[in-house]
């Protein structure tokens, strides 16, 4: 397994990490994702550790805390061998302190997560969303205190806009608070919006990308193709409305190129889609999920080999999107590109 520094931090993480969204299985969304219990979760953790995957990601909102509980049971007795990443901010109830990133909420949410996980520290705590109702200074001062207390070690964010992340980094620098080292983002061959602003920001500021849904919410599994009905067992029947938007015709074009490359090199469509991401700038780790051992072992096969330059160019071309303003002049006009050439 290859390991990379998480952004500009000294924390080294595997290029593949395990997303525990399938653990617990409560509610319409997470129930459709999977219902992995503690016994099965422990087997999946065993497989991950054997392969060198030691970072496990969850969130308090996943199955109303059950995902954290199951993960905690699955890693019991081997805490020193794993890195735990969890997230908070989204609503866990209807009370005034059940959502957001206020001082009261962050302290309580961290303590609750520690209890559910059965540990006394969290390696990486991420804000699941930007809370516009809480001053950034309050958020960062609280996180600074949690780091000083030993309850968390590194901090990151998820699903932030560029200005939200940049302002947070500036406030941290101004007041001497720890900086965010990771941004958990949606990024896939079927969704490359991350590249317009968040990727250059991450490269400039040393914020590593942790990629969620590398298979485009289950659309790049190799089971969805042009002219064929959605498989009866696909979770997209229940979860499509929760996921990122996808242009179906473009998706089919991407899958056709993935199919062709899969035939050429003897790899699967998901393995190729994940491997492509590992070659993109700023990507520290890609989160893979699995409802069973077979899915996990297949996804683990995405590392240990490389796509050719020609294959990467084909995937780049078929998945390319039209850049929105103000990004398109830098990709279409030499004068603009000379001043600020795109990263990809």
Which residue ranges define each predicted feature?
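Terminal-tail/helix-coil boundary detector
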Residues: 1-2, 42, 204, 228-264, ...
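N-terminal binding-site loop/beta-alpha segment at the start of enzyme catalytic domains
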Residues: 1-82
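Conserved, mostly hydrophobic/aromatic
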Residues: 6, 18, 41, 48, ...
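Short, well-ordered coil/turn segments that N-cap beta-strands
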Residues: 11-16, 52-55, 78-82, 118-123, ...
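Glycine/proline-rich, positively charged
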Residues: 27, 33, 93-197
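Generic structural signal for well-ordered alpha-helices
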Residues: 45, 68, 72, 110-114, ...
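Glycine-rich beta-alpha junction loops
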Residues: 88-90, 161, 187-191, 213-221, ...
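Aromatic-lined glycan-binding groove of carbohydrate-active enzymes
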Residues: 194-234, 268
